[in-house]
Amino acid sequence: LSGGQAQRVAIARAIADHPKVLLADEPMSAVDVAARTQILASFAAIRSGEPDMALIMVSHDLGVVQHIADRIMVLHDGCVEECGLTETVLHHPTSDYTKRLLDAASL
């Protein structure tokens, strides 16, 4: 299996039992652009088809976070820098660290 296919299989296995919480740790790592698009579509389908399932995603990719998350928590050195609605945090950050991250990511 390719990296993207393996990621999709892992996602399918994880949701097969309809857990209340799904933890995805860097689900876009080591996948190409096409696989990334398919994985994002899988998570979007989970969000719409499993309204009682909470998806907690760890990601360094703010572009992914922007498309998937309702809420975001920015961590720095193991501490919470900022937490809130994704739209608010990404467009009106209060933390200097968050502002630097967003500038670096060109969001």
Language model regions located:
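Conserved catalytic motifs of ABC-family nucleotide-binding domains
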Residues: 18
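Helical segment within the ABC ATPase nucleotide-binding domain
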Residues: 37-51
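A short, surface-exposed alpha-helical micro-motif characterized by mixed small hydrophobic
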Residues: 65-67
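Short, glycine/charged-rich "phosphate-handling" switch motifs in NTP-dependent
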Residues: 71, 83
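C-terminal boundary and immediately downstream tail of ABC-type ATPase nucleotide-binding domains
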Residues: 90-107
